[in-house]
């Protein structure tokens, strides 16, 4: 049986901890919170959790429910600025720290999310919606 990174880091409980910690920070963040149109962050949290589960080799529930991730397209209506990407990384770092991965696992995860955060920047303006 092939072991995936998802399995190596502890599967769903680990992703759940990372994402819950991340969204606890987002909920209080004055830069990021306005980017989420829903009153309740729960649906966004669930989508992100399912995306990360699938990305790292777990069940493909995300694609089964939502199709191809198309991350830039899904985020296009929102002004993702360099400042927003930085704040996003601050909260994701808190999530990774809470998960207490091995240094190698942490580096692999962090490398992906830092690249993803930079990739999602779509404007230099400080507007929350485009």
Segments and roles (model prediction):
Residues 1-3, 16-97, 103, 109-112, ...:
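Heme-based O2/NO sensor domains and their adjacent alpha-helical segments
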Residues 1, 5-11:
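Short, low-complexity N-terminal intrinsically disordered segments enriched in polar/charged residues
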């Amino acid at each position: 049986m092939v072991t995936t990174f998802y399995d190596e880091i502890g599967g769903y409980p680990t992703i759940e901890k990372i994402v819950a910690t991340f969204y606890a920070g987002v909920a209080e963040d004055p830069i990021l919170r306005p980017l989420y149109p829903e009153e309740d962050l729960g649906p966004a949290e669930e989508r992100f959790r399912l995306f990360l589960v699938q990305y790292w080799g777990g069940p493909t529930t995300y694609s089964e429910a939502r199709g191809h991730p198309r991350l830039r397209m899904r985020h296009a209506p929102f002004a993702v600025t360099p400042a927003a990407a930085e704040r996003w990384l601050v909260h994701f770092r808190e999530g990774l720290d809470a998960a207490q991965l091995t240094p190698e696992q942490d580096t692999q995860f962090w490398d992906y999310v830092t690249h993803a955060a930079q990739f999602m920047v779509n404007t230099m303006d400080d507007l929350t919606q485009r």
